[in-house]
Amino acid sequence: MKCKFCSREAYIKIHYPKMYLCEEHFKEYFERKVSRTIERYKLLTKDERILVAVSGGKDSAVTAYVLKKLGYNIECLHINLGISGYSEKSEEYAKKQCKLIGAPLHIVRIKEILGYGIGEVKTRRPPCSYCGLTKRYIMNKFAYDNGFDAIATGHNLDDEASFLLNNILHWNTEYLAKGGPILPQQGKFIKKVKPLYEVTEREVVAYALAVGLEYIVEECPYARGATTLDMKGVLNELEEKRPGTKFNFVRGYLKKKKLFEPEIKEKEIKECKICRMPSSGDICAFCKFWGLKKEINFKVSSTDEEPFGP
C-alpha cells in the first residue's frame, strides 16, 4: 500500500482514522498529534522546566524525544529500582536514549539511598504497591528540590483506557474525579502531565522504531499478572472489532468527568515531620514505609551522568 500523502510505500496502517502512512509522514503525524494534545489540554508552555521520568522503556523515551523535538525545555530522571538483572538493563537503555535525544540525565538509585531494592524489603505489601509509592515520591521530591515546573510521564492512550476501565469496574470515584492528562500543581505537589495521552501504544512503538530509539522490551518481573494487562487485553479485542473504541472511551470520560467531582473528599493536608512534604498524617507514607529519620535532599548542582548530546 502507498502512503496517503505521497507515493512512498506505507510504513504503518493507522486504524483510527483509517489511513496508510510512510515513515516520514507518520513521524509528522505523531508529532503533530502530541503537539495538539499539549495545546488542547494546556499541558505545557515553552518557558517551563520539564522533568521527564524515563524508565528505559519505549513510552517515556518517546515522550522525552518528542518534547525535545517540539522545542520544550526538558531534563530526564531515571529511577534505578534495584531489581537485580532488570534495573541494570533499564538504566543502560535510559542512558542510550538520553544520548540520542540530547537531554541531561539525572539518576537516582534507590538501593544507594534507601538500602534496599524493590523486592528486597520484608513486608506484606506487594512490590508493585510500594514501588509505585516510591517512584511517585522521588519524582515529585526531585522535581520540587530542583525547581522544575512540571513532570512529564509516558502514559499512552492504552494505559489511560485500561486505568479508566479498571476504576469504573471498581467504582473508584475519586480516581474518576481526578483522572485525565493533567494533574495541576498543588502546593509542593508538582504539576504532572501526559503528552502521549491520545496516542496508542502501537503508534508509540512505531515511532520509537522510526527515530531509532532502543528500549528495554522485558517486562518488570513483578508486573506479571497485573490487572492492567487484563484490562488492555479486553480493550484490544474491542478495538479490533470497533476501531476508535479506546479514543472515544477516554474522550467520552473527559466530557463526563465533572459528574464525579462531588465525590472528591476534602482531606486535611499536613506537612511530614521528617521530609516536610505534603502528607495526610504526621509522617508521610514514603517516610513511614522506608523508616526514614531524616529528609533526603535531591538537590543537584550537575547531572549524575555528564549531559548527553550536543
Curated annotation (Swiss-Prot):
Gene Ontology CC annotation, any one: cytosolic tRNA wobble base thiouridylase complex
Comment field (misc): In TtuA from T.thermophilus, the sulfur inserted into the nucleoside comes from the C-terminal thiocarboxylate of TtuB, but there is no TtuB ortholog in P.horikoshii. Free sulfide has been shown to be present at relatively high concentrations within thermophilic archaea, and may be the sulfur source in vivo.
Cofactor annotation: [4Fe-4S] cluster; Mg(2+)
Binding-site list for ATP: 53, 79, 135, 154
InterPro entries: Ncs6/Tuc1/Ctu1, Rhodanese-like_dom, Rossmann-like_a/b/a_fold, TilS/TtcA_N, tRNA_thiolation_TtcA_Ctu1, TtuA-like_LIM_N
Functional note: Catalyzes the ATP-dependent 2-thiolation of 5-methyluridine residue at position 54 in the T loop of tRNAs, leading to 5-methyl-2-thiouridine (m(5)s(2)U or s(2)T). This modification allows thermal stabilization of tRNAs in thermophilic microorganisms, and is required for cell growth at high temperatures. Can use free sulfide as sulfur source in vitro, which may be also the sulfur source in vivo.
Name assigned to this protein: tRNA-5-methyluridine(54) 2-sulfurtransferase
Residues annotated to bind Zn(2+) 2: 272, 275, 284, 287
Cystine connections: 128-220
Catalytic activity entry: 5-methyluridine(54) in tRNA + hydrogen sulfide + ATP = 5-methyl-2-thiouridine(54) in tRNA + AMP + diphosphate
Cofactor binding annotation: Binds 1 [4Fe-4S] cluster per subunit. The cluster is chelated by three Cys residues, the fourth Fe with a free coordination site may bind a small ligand, such as exogenous sulfide, thus acting as a sulfur carrier.
